[in-house]
Amino acid sequence: MARRVSTTRLLLLLLLVAAAAAAAAGDQEDPRGGGDNGTARLDRRTKMFLHAARASDGGATGMEKAGLGLFDAFFASLSMILVSEIGDETFIIAALMAMRHPKSTVLSGALSALVVMTILSTGLGRIVPNLISRKHTNSAATVLYAFFGLRLLYIAWRSDSKASQKKEIEEVEEKLEAGQGKSTFRRIFSRFCTPIFLESFVLTFLAEWGDRSQIATIALATHKNAVGVAVGATLGHTICTSFAVVGGSMLASKISQGTVATIGGLLFLGFSLSSYFYPPL
């Protein structure tokens, strides 16, 4: 009887040891499996994180390039307007009208016309590449820049600054006197705007249409950031027209047209070289 009890106890002890060993083996396998699953989840999270990081880096690079393109277009259009509009026909129109009419009205009319012209020119510059390939538009812009640059340098070399300035002022005065008798246009729109505002707007708009600054604005907008070109050109027109209205003909007479033409010619030639050696992608 005692032997049977001992045998039974021994079997129970062996069963307990076997169960404990099996449990220990299961516990060792579970952490490994859990580790594998955790590693897989970690790998997936790492890949997702790396993908998001690369995407954010790409977005940051794109934003950086867009910012540089905006600044480049802004500076190019601003400098182009400053060197081409000072002493130009629109500059003299604003200066002469400000001598006889309220400066604020003349300034608002001239700036309104120039802003409208800038928007139209920038829009044309963005439409043209959709009709013509960027390669051809860039080539045309290069030729236009070179043409205007050489033309300005030729004007600076051949013209007498005082004589040419006096002649241009006389031509503008003749246009202003010729427009005094045409009151039908003023009467029609007098309910909406004052006659002085309309006169300043119409004369500035017609003088700017087809001018070298308008063509240069169109050329800039074909291969540079349109917003930067529009903002830079608008700021340049605002500065030049404000100087014309405040200073009048005194400011225009003190600025050497030969110097302005030389600076403008060199700037346009610089644009031409930049467009030729660094074409848009």
Curated annotation (Swiss-Prot):
It is found in: Membrane. InterPro entries: GDT1-like (IPR001727). Residues 1-22 form the signal peptide. One of its GO terms (molecular function) is manganese ion transmembrane transporter activity. One of its GO terms (cellular component) is Golgi apparatus. The chain crosses the membrane at residues 66-86, 105-125, 137-157, 188-208, 226-246, 258-278. Keywords: Membrane, Signal, Transmembrane, Transmembrane helix. One of its GO terms (biological process) is Golgi calcium ion transport. It is a multi-pass membrane protein. Its main location: membrane. PANTHER family: GDT1-LIKE PROTEIN 3 (PTHR12608:SF9), TRANSMEMBRANE PROTEIN HTP-1 RELATED (PTHR12608). Belongs to the GDT1 family. This is GDT1-like protein 4. It comes from Oryza sativa subsp. indica.
